[in-house]
Amino acid sequence: MALDGIRMPDGCYADGTWELKMHVTDLNRDVSLRVTGEIHIGGVMLKLVEKLDVKKDWSDHALWWEKKKTWLLKTHWTLDKYGIQADARLLFTPQHKLLRLQLPNMKHMRVKVNFSDRVFKAVSDICKTFNIRHPEELSLLRKPRDPKKKKKKLEDAEEETLELEGPLLTPGSGSIYSSPGLYSKTMTPTYDSRDGSPLSPTSAWFGDSPLSEGNPSILAVSQPITSPDILVKMYKPQSLLDKAKINQGWLDSSRSLMEQDVKENEVLLLRFKYHSFFDLNPKYDAIRVNQLYEQAKWAILLEEIECTEEEMMMFAALQYHINKLSIMSSDNHMNNSEKEVDEVDAALSDLEITLEGGKTSNTLGDITSIPELADYVKVFKPKKLTLKGYKQYWCTFKDITISCYKSREEAHGTPAHQMNLRGCEVTPDVNISGQKFNIKLLIPVADGMNEIWLRCDTEKQYAQWMAACRLASKGKTMADSSYNLEVQNILSFLKMQHMNPDPQIIEPITTDINPECLVSPRYLKKYKNKQPGFVRDLISARILEAHQNVAQMSLIEAKMRFIQAWQSLPEFGITHFLAKFQGGKKDELIGITYNRLIRMDAGTGDAIKTWRFSNMKQWNVNWEIKMVTVEFADEPSLAFICAEVDCKVVHEFIGGYIFLSTRAKDQNESLDEEMFYKLTSGWV
């Protein structure tokens, strides 16, 4: 027997070679190669392809090490360097595989995605396919399982699928994502800013993508919910704990799909993960605006975010208006390609949604003095075992401080109460029909938060004081350029909720309004309990009343207003996770927003303590005990253990928001992918 044929106990042959077992997924075939540890990965693949002797383009294939869950992408590395021995089993498989993506509009699309790219890069490629700017705001989420549905097949069968396949996304496009107009101010408008339809042929922005063979503009068009049964069947979180469980499903942006056990043809949800929408511009972002609108719409209908009855009717009226205009737009656009949009552009210039909620005013104003507010305001300090209500004070709002005096005449003396609003939580409590305009303040103190309520008499007073409170919570004064726009946005939000029916202009109730599809099940049930026999007519009448306030809006303006109103809700932008705080005895919630961390009561959702990112020095993770520690400039450190969720998800949210806060319109047009990994991965 030849020496090279003698096999040793460790599986190696006497000549130093050994058998490497591989499975070729495309052919469903097992192959063994005699190799040494000194052969590099590229050489292994070359030998394998030669042995297979199958004429095929193998350029997209790579080796995957099942046991270690690792792609062997460094083709110049040897087997020894990777630590691969005779007991290893490798897969020779395509890097690009099909995924079924559920978009924010709940439609499903088949897209080929690179399973070897990090998720952050894969999402960038997906967004490039769909012409969605600022892909850093989105990510992939595993579908939450409805505990009421035990059979997965039954759940999958209920999904409405839109079978449009995206283009083949090729690897090797570079580590820095760049697309025309990521931050550019000199882009050519791609969409009509009145209705969001493409100004150029679809092939110009989807290229030779199979999407252009179908109907790509469907991504920019809102499709109405056709049956209330769809709402009934969909999973609705019943509590804050349910919402926290949904957030366990976010994928790790620093690892590939394959490393996270994502299978070919699996359903993943593409969602706006970070609620910080940068440079939202209807001229270039019709698809982005529509998908944002859809995510907001479904969040409200599935009760993922709380709103009042008046707000629900306002959202329903906007939906009804958008549904009507979407149908009209698709019918009329071919005959109206040239439109006068100057007035729409002017109106929309005030609607651009940025991190701070506004943009610089054209007027400089008086830069030598900081505006102040002074008025009679009712103040209430809730305490246990007290029945005392609101007490009226003469209040002055200077810089970021509210001072309360017993009367206007005493305003030059010592205030009875004084509140510094930096870092406070500001929550609206408004009922238009009841003329209730309250502002709830949770003001940080050494041992938690002090609760103070302000009651205003009019919408104008409320808008001015609420805008000032929101700015002060961020450490900004009324001299900030965004103050006046914030006041106008609040007044606009209130105006849309007015119910002043004029019989002359209210539309007759028609059968196509489908009110059951425009309001959440909770409010539908509430109306059923009130007047069981007339639910449909009652809700339709309320929606048509509210519709008067939005009936003159263009399609894209209505969507932008919907997004803006969604942003105005108290719970907007808070991502919840179950956590146990150091020194605490029970599970609580940690809420993460674009600018702060919130310790919350798991039962009620009330804020217990708030920490601003602007005051944060650094944060660290102890991966063994799943503890996140955050250090601040002038207050004690925060430490909590993540419960039921990988602390990497929480760590990534904090780092992700820090990363997004560094964006600026005047920076270059590329996205610093490596900086994102440094802030979010935890081990780069």
UniProtKB/Swiss-Prot annotation:
InterPro entries: Band_41_domain (IPR019749), FERM_2 (IPR035963), FERM_central (IPR019748), Kindlin/fermitin (IPR037843), Kindlin_2_N (IPR040790), PH-like_dom_sf (IPR011993), PH_domain (IPR001849), PH_Kindlin/fermitin (IPR037837). It comes from the Eukaryota. One of its GO terms (biological process) is Wnt signaling pathway. Residues 378-474 form the PH domain. It is a peripheral membrane protein. It is found in: Cytoplasm; Cytoplasm, Cell cortex; Cytoplasm, Cytoskeleton; Cytoplasm, Cytoskeleton, Stress fiber. Residues 279-577 form the FERM domain. Its main location: cytoplasm. The keyword Zinc does not apply. A 1,2-diacyl-sn-glycero-3-phospho-(1D-myo-inositol-3,4,5-trisphosphate) binds at residue 381. Scaffolding protein that enhances integrin activation mediated by TLN1 and/or TLN2, but activates integrins only weakly by itself. Binds to membranes enriched in phosphoinositides. Enhances integrin-mediated cell adhesion onto the extracellular matrix and cell spreading; this requires both its ability to interact with integrins and with phospholipid membranes. Required for the assembly of focal adhesions. Participates in the connection between extracellular matrix adhesion sites and the actin cytoskeleton and also in the orchestration of actin assembly and cell shape modulation. Belongs to the kindlin family. The FERM domain is not correctly detected by PROSITE or Pfam techniques because it contains the insertion of a PH domain. The PH domain binds phospholipids. Binds preferentially phosphatidylinositol-3,4,5-trisphosphate, and has lower affinity for phosphatidylinositol-4,5-bisphosphate. This is Fermitin family homolog 2.
